[in-house]
């Protein structure tokens, strides 16, 4: 096997190899082939097959001369599609078939023996004697011909699989379909053998007679001529039909075609197969077939009966009967496979009788058809030739497997024949072209490009750039699924740095952090060598960073010394005397099982020997894999391969499963450079350390390592270390963000656009020349009984509308108008049928760009104006128009790897993004008297936490997260009321996984509560209790005004006040009044927290009296209005921290009113303990009820704090620890549908391995009969889980209800559900039918809704729906699939809006074949890649899954992006609007929020200098909009309208303060707190900043030091 990058290089390579073989007559051809099999594969390929050295040389000679002869396959992969293995039927048999392969290939022999033994159980004679005997007539008898073909075909298929030729589809011809069914996994070997023998025996027992005639005619021509007793047996090609039946009738038809000059051929058969003459055997055969149990195909399987992919009835008894009687639709099968993307057909059987039929059947397109065992050619040469033919045109072949067991060994062969061309420009006088031209020193090193000497010190810095493009060999160093720069590479970098300063010894080098390599991403490296000390030693460090905007990461550090180590021992005697060879024939396979997935460049280890405690190894640099050892001291791939011997030696002696990496190198000296073939000796160097001596091929010294220490690392630790080091890629989940856009009414000339017409008018033909037609979907409502039915009805209607529209070919726009089908963040999706219609319409948009616009609105809109905006999808809420953009989901805070002593803290920058994780060692200190240590599961977030994070808390801010819940880990002295294992809630004093707390401040969690529910109680209920009961001493019959009544403290205070007989008045924003009404308030007792109208309203309701108590958390004029509402003797309780008044001034201005600003901490531990007990008792007696809770993973704290700061929550916001979800799932049961599919199986294994789930229920229609179910269950059981595989059609409501009823009786509580089932039936919109929609909807919509209803009353922690990105972006040809998945997306939002667990994972493309991706060809994958979507591995998919669960937004788009492809589409103007926020734009200055303000001002002033006034303003407007977008959580500055008022954009007092903080840092100006309200739009603020920057200071509208008096987070109480 030879390959090259060009045709010229291929012939040159053949010439070099031919000359080498001729010059070395001792070379064994097997060794040559084995060595070539390990090389990299390029585009231009050739395979030479020969039985002798002479034949191989002749083949190489013809190839080198450009005239390839017999036994030589030459080709170049084009658009490689799917591969099909075809099994021939009766007539292909011949005496001796398979005998040569049986003797040459053990895999063929093993498979043949297994099949023959099974067949012999049913045959009257041993099959081997028949096939390899001398009686051809016996073999030709149907009784033996059919089993014989089955045996040879199954064994041939085993060879193909062993060689790595893995087909996408299989099909057979007549009895050959039984071999195909077995190959696809439908039939077990025992069942298939029984069936094939019975088939042949029963046919043989029929009376002889009848005729079969092949005629050159079409099926349509033959069909009218058929009469009684004769039929069509096979349609082998469009113009090749076999007639079968009574001899006279068959011959009569044949004679008619012969008379027309058509080719007619009488087949030599004993019976007329596939004809009416077969009917006497059918009944008995049906009884045999009924004993066979069919399974779901593991490969695509095409049916002879239908000519299409096997359907649900494939393999039934009736099917096999029909298969005997009905025609073989072989031509239809071949054509259907071509429509599925098949380009390569391999006939696996004796002869090549089907190749012609396939070629005739296929459309005139590129397709290769080869036969594996051609007649009149040695069988092994024929099989190898077939493999070579498909390989040269793109089908993967594992040539190393071909040579396995041959005894071949790797030998030195000529390296690649480079076709050298010069692409470098000749340096001119205009600029430097190398390091010297830039004033830098050149290194002449392959990894380091330049050296810089510090002029003011003795320090030296060496720089370089690494990438998988420039150093492709690095891509072969894969550890636990991650491409790592090898530890040996750091040694090479430091050795070169030592050479620069005259230090020949690495005294020590410790690896601090991995250097991860990502495709398409370059990495800068710097080796920093410090100044020499008195003894000449120098510190050395290696740093890396991904791009200019990232910080440097320390990867390694150590010390250099001057003197080299002593010369190592002599290894000239080789192999060493007395050393025993160690078998490493499967060495790299063993290493792969332990996480070392080394590619060819790192597979240089060729031999190992052992002598006592010593170990010896030989390594050869794989030059053909791009490992060039020149310009290196010791190539990292060579040194790394040396160390592989250690891994294999451990494997051989200890059966270790650890993955270990180099950690600390000591005493390293390089004695010679450029070695490509080395010998190595290993010896013990103390505890856990080894020494290494490396010599060249003559035994002379190359490298010495006095001591090397390795350390184990798991895949999880590696991922955590990569993340903590900032080395993770930016490929996290995406979310759909609806951003406000500006809409200008009127056309270009200011005139209004023509009015739109309705769909009814369009259908009636009365639409005239309207440019916009509107089809409005009537809302289906939300009745549970009608939801599924409404989805079917709506999608059917939508299909009819879309098909009519697209068929009309009108130059107009169709507007699909819905209400509640999509929504803003946090909104309920009230019309799930509309959600499904959006999915279908998105697919129609993708197929027909520019013809359809989707609009979802809450009020009447002008569709003509919106249709002209240029956005394909729009959402209108409250008069504001929004457009969707994909945006990276919020980044997770990085947690310390393997560290539990940490705490969430404010970062000090005045913004919520500054939240950080800080070490907290005090929680691990020894316990004092009365203390307990708690493993925290959940922490409540309060308003004061948000205030503290923004730097607004007066005085010393407390730790974030005052309250929480968890489990007691340890008790200190004098603790009597609590024990280890108790679940407790209370005041834990910080947001982290561990807390130490006084026992007085916690109490036990009530039975049946979750930790999140418990964490929501202490602060809010005790704050309300302390304020109302202790401070206000409120009494029955009095009245209280509670501001922010839907917040945590507000809802708690409402419950307590009512419990005590108090009349309650409450405020909230109007959007939350329905919540208040649901709490039992009438409108007379509800006020608006965004205006002061509540004062007048409540005075009127109370007939001018007012209220007795105010519980306040507002600021500014809201405080004054509330004070005016108090009666004489009234009590004003201030919980807020932003507007605290002077009590004496209040008393003077409001006679008789008592003003008290308070904090719960004033109560003291003893009183807090009493209140905790009292509250707990009221919960136990059900006089108090738990609050609504919104949970966030603590790693999403910035998003949670922002959610709370914007007053979007109802009840409490709670942060859960990363382990909380795993703990909940591990304690309960998780139900997975579709678990045997590609996605479901990966997630099932991940839940067990990563989350510790111990009870799994895998539901599918076929239960344990589903393909792969038994294997999956066994794997999960071995991993420690209890697994139940159940047969349940989840689309059947009664079946689902029954399943969950059973689970409630027999299993731990269900805590999680994953719905991963689904089916495909792809077609473009114009080809879809209602039936095809229903097929796809049933598996997704019915099933998901049934699961939703069955679990709505359960306390789930996870309800995950496996959706598809097709629903989000609109996938051409998948309108039904997009509709079904859009329903899932809407259902997840619907559940979250109802307070239930719910997330929809819109999966992108999985790299793993099978399941939903089985139908995709390489052409499909390439198209998807060009679109900007990259395939993800299972490891990458579960990382996205974990991140999505942590972020917990209703919709997570789980896909990897190809940024280069996105950029290319953007530059070509072909990037959909939805993706526009993901393409990298021209580089702009980014504001450094943590930078020095003075430097920011200076930099900004420099940018403004020299610009015209309008240009300055434009720049500043962009700056303000950028910071505003960051505060509002929008993707970019373009998502903020510069002329919209901040209040309308969504700003309130808190967010206004944050924006002011950001602008202060970005501009360097001292900005007043009221700047956002004094200048109400981004443009106005930019104008103000421009004046300040120019030195002009306008008159302020008020005192710049005054308090902000705008509405202050009206619904957020101080502790809620």
Swiss-Prot record:
Gene inactivation effect: Disruption of pks1 abolishes the production of phthiocerol dimycocerosate (DIM) on the cell envelope, but the production of mycocerosic acid is not deficient. The pks10 mutants show a major attenuation of virulence.
Coiled-coil features, chain-numbered ranges: none
O-(pantetheine 4'-phosphoryl)serine PTM sites in chain numbering: 1549
Chain spans, region Disordered: 1588-1616
Start and end residues of each stretch annotated as Beta-ketoacyl reductase: 1228-1409
Biased composition (Polar residues): 1588-1604
One record GO biological process: Actinobacterium-type cell wall biogenesis
Cofactor: pantetheine 4'-phosphate
Segments forming domain Carrier: 1514-1589
UniProt remark on cofactor binding: Binds 1 phosphopantetheine covalently.
GO molecular function: fatty acid synthase activity; oxidoreductase activity; phosphopantetheine binding
Acyltransferase: annotated segments: 83-397
Pfam family, one: PS-DH
Stretch list, region Enoylreductase: 910-1215
Keywords: Acyltransferase, Fatty acid metabolism, Lipid metabolism, Phosphopantetheine, Phosphoprotein, Transferase
Keyword Ribosomal protein: no
Function summary: May play a role in phthiocerol biosynthesis.
Additional remarks: Was identified as a high-confidence drug target.
Name of the protein in its database record: Putative inactive phenolphthiocerol synthesis polyketide synthase type I Pks1
Gene: pks1
């Amino acid at each position: 096997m030879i390959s090259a990058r060009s045709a010229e290089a291929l012939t040159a390579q053949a010439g070099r190899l031919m000359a080498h073989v001729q010059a070395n007559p001792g070379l064994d051809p097997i060794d040559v082939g084995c060595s070539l099999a390990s090389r990299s594969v390029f585009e231009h390929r050739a395979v030479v097959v020969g039985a002798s050295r002479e034949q191989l040389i002749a083949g190489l000679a013809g190839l080198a001369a450009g005239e390839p002869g017999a036994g030589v396959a030459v080709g170049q992969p084009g658009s490689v599609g799917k591969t099909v293995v075809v099994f021939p039927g009766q007539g292909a048999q011949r005496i001796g078939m398979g005998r040569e392969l049986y003797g040459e290939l053990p895999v063929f022999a093993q498979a043949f023996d297994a099949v023959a033994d099974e067949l012999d159980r049913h045959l009257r004679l041993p099959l081997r004697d028949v096939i390899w005997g001398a009686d051809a007539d016996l073999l030709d008898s149907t009784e033996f011909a059919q089993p014989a073909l089955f045996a040879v075909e199954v064994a041939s298929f085993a060879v193909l699989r062993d060689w790595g030729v893995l087909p996408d589809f299989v099909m057979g011809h007549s009895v050959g379909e039984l071999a195909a069914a077995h190959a696809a996994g439908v039939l077990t070997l025992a069942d298939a053998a029984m069936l094939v023998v019975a088939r042949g025996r029963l046919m043989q027992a029929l009376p002889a007679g009848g005729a079969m005639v092949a005629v050159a005619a079409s099926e349509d021509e033959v069909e009218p001529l058929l009469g009684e007793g004769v039929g069509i047996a096979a349609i082998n090609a469009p113009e090749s039909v076999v007639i079968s039946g009574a001899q006279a009738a068959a011959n009569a038809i044949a004679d008619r075609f012969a008379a027309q000059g058509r080719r007619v051929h009488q087949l030599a058969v004993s019976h007329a197969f596939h004809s009416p003459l077969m009917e006497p055997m059918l009944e008995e055969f049906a009884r045999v077939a009924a004993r066979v149990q069919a399974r779901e195909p593991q490969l695509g399987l095409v049916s002879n009966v239908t000519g299409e992919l096997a359907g649900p009835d494939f393999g039934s008894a009736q099917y096999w009967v029909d298969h005997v009687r009905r025609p073989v639709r072989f031509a239809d099968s071949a054509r259907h496979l071509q429509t599925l993307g098949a380009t390569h057909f391999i006939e696996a059987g004796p002869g090549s009788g089907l190749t012609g039929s396939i070629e005739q059947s296929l459309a005139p397109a590129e397709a290769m058809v080869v036969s594996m065992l051609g007649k009149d050619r040695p069988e092994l040469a024929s099989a190898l030739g077939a493999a070579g033919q498909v390989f040269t045109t793109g089908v993967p072949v594992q040539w190393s497997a071909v040579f396995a067991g041959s005894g071949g060994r790797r030998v030195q062969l000529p390296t690649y024949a480079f076709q050298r061309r010069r692409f470098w420009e000749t340096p001119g006088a205009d600029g430097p072209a190398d390091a010297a031209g830039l004033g830098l020193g050149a290194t002449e090193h392959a990894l380091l490009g330049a050296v810089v000497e510090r002029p003011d010190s003795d320090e030296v810095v060496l720089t370089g750039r690494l990438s998988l493009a420039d150093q492709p060999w690095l891509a072969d160093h894969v550890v636990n699924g991650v491409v790592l720069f090898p530890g040996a590479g750091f040694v090479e970098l430091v050795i070169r740095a030592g050479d620069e300063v005259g230090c020949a010894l690495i005294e020590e080098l410790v690896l601090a952090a991995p250097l991860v390599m990502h495709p398409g991403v370059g990495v800068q490296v710097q080796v920093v060598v410090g100044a020499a000390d008195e003894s000449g030693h120098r510190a050395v460090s290696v740093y890396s960073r991904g791009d200019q905007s990232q910080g440097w990461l320390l990867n390694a550090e150590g010390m250099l010394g001057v003197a080299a180590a002593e010369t190592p021992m002599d290894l000239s005697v080789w192999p060493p005397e007395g050393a025993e060879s160690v078998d490493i024939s499967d060495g790299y396979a063993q290493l792969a099982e332990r996480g070392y997935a080394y590619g060819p460049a790192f597979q240089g280890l060729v031999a190992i020997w052992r002598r006592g405690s010593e170990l010896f190894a030989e390594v050869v640099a794989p030059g053909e894999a791009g490992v060039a050892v020149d310009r290196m001291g010791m190539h990292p791939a060579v040194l790394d391969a040396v160390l592989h011997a250690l891994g294999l030696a451990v494997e051989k002696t200890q059966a270790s499963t650890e993955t270990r990496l180099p950690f600390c190198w000591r005493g390293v000296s390089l004695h010679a450079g450029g070695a490509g073939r080395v010998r190595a000796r290993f010896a013990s160097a103390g505890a856990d350390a080894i020494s290494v001596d490396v010599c060249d091929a003559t035994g002379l010294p190359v490298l010495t390592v006095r001591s090397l220490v390795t350390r184990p690392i798991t895949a999880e630790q590696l991922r955590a270390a990569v993340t903590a080091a900032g080395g993770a890629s930016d490929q996290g989940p995406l979310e759909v963000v609806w951003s406000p856009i500006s809409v200008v009414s009127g056309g270009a000339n200011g005139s209004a656009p023509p009015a739109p017409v309705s769909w009814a008018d369009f259908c009636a033909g009365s639409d005239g020349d309207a440019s916009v037609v509107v089809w409005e979907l009537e809302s289906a409502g939300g009745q549970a009984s009608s939801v599924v039915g409404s989805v079917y009805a709506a999608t059917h209607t939508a299909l009819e509308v879309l098909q009519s529209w697209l068929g009309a070919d009108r130059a107009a726009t169709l507007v699909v108008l819905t209400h509640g089908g999509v929504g803003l963040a946090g909104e309920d999706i009230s019309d799930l049928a509309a959600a499904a219609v959006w999915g279908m319409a998105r697919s129609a948009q993708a197929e027909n760009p520019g013809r359809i616009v989707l609009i979802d609105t809450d009020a009447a809109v002008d569709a003509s104006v919106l249709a002209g905006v240029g956005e394909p999808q729009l959402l209108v809420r409250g008069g504001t128009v929004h457009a969707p953009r994909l945006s990276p989901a919020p980044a997770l805070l990085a947690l310390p790897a393997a560290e539990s002593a940490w705490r969430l803290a404010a970062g000090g920058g005045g913004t919520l993004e500054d939240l950080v994780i800080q070490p907290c060692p005090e929680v691990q200190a020894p316990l004092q008297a009365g203390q307990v240590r708690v493993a925290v599961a959940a922490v409540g977030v309060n308003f004061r936490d948000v205030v503290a994070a923004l730097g607004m808390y007066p005085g010393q801010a407390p730790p974030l997260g005052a309250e929480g819940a968890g489990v007691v880990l340890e008790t200190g002295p004098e603790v009597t009321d609590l024990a280890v294992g108790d679940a407790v809630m209370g005041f834990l004093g910080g947001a982290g996984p561990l807390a130490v707390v006084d026992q007085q401040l916690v109490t036990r969690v009530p039975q049946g509560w979750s930790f999140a529910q418990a964490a929501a109680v202490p602060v809010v209920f005790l704050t309300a209790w302390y304020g109302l009961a202790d401070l206000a001493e409120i009494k029955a019959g009095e009245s209280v005004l509670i501001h922010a009544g839907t917040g945590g403290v507000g809802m708690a205070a409402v419950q307590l006040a009512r419990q005590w007989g108090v009349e309650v008045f409450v405020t909230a924003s109007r959007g939350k009044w329905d919540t208040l009404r649901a709490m039992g308030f009438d409108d007379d007792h509800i006020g608006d927290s965004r205006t002061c109208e509540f004062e007048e309203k409540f005075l009127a309701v109370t007939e001018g009296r007012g209220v007795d108590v105010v519980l306040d958390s507002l600021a500014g004029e809201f405080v004054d209005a509330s004070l005016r509402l108090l009666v004489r003797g009234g009590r004003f309780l201030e919980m807020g921290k932003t507007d605290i008044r002077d009590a004496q001034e209040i008393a003077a201005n409001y006679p008789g009113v008592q003003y008290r600003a308070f904090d719960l901490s004033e109560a003291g531990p003893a009183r807090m303990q009493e209140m905790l007990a009292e509250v707990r008792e009221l919960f136990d007696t059900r006089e108090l009820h738990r609050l609504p809770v919104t949970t966030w993973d603590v790693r999403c704290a910035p998003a949670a704090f922002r959610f709370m700061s914007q007053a979007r929550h109802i009840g409490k916001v709670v942060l859960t620890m990363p382990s909380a979800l795993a703990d909940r799932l591990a304690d309960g049961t998780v139900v997975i549908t579709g678990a045997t599919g590609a996605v479901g199986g990966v997630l099932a294994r991940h839940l067990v391995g990563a989350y510790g789930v111990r009870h799994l229920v895998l539901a599918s229609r076929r239960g344990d009969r589903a393909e792969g179910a038994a294997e999956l269950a066994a794997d999960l059981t071995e991993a420690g889980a209890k697994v139940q595989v159940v047969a349940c059609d989840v689309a059947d409501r009664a079946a689902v209800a029954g399943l969950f009823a059973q689970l409630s009786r027999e299993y731990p509580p269900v805590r999680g559900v994953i719905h991963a089932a689904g089916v495909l039936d792809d077609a473009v919109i114009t080809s879809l039918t209602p039936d095809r929609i229903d097929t796809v909807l049933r598996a997704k919509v019915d099933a998901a809704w049934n699961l939703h209803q069955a679990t709505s009353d359960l306390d789930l922690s996870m309800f995950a729906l496996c959706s598809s990105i097709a629903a989000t972006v609109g996938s051409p040809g998948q309108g039904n699939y997009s509709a079904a998945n859009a329903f899932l997306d809407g259902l997840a939002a619907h559940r979250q809006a109802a307070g239930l667990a719910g997330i929809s994972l819109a999966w992108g493309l999985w790299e793993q074949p099978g399941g939903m991706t089985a139908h995709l060809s390489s052409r499909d994958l390439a198209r998807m890649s060009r679109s900007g979507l990259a395939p993800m591995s299972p490891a990458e998919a579960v990382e996205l899954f974990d991140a999505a669960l942590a972020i917990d937004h209703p919709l997570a788009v789980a896909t990897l992006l190809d940024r280069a492809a996105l950029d290319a589409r953007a530059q070509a103007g072909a990037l959909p609007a939805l993706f526009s926020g993901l393409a990298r734009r021209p580089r702009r200055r980014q504001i450094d929020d943590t930078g020095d303000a003075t430097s920011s001002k200076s930099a900004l002033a420099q940018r403004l200098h020299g610009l015209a006034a309008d240009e300055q303003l434009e720049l500043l407007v962009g700056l303000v909009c950028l910071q505003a977008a960051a505060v509002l959580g929008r993707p970019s500055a373009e998502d903020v309208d510069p002329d919209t008022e901040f209040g309308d954009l969504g700003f309130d007092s808190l967010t206004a303060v944050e924006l002011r903080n950001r602008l202060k840092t970005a501009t360097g100006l001292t900005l007043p707190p009221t700047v956002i309200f004094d200048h109400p739009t981004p443009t106005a603020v930019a104008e103000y900043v421009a004046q300040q920057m120019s030195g002009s200071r306008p008159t302020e509208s008020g005192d710049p030091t005054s308090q902000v008096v705008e509405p202050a987070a009206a619904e957020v109480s101080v502790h809620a």
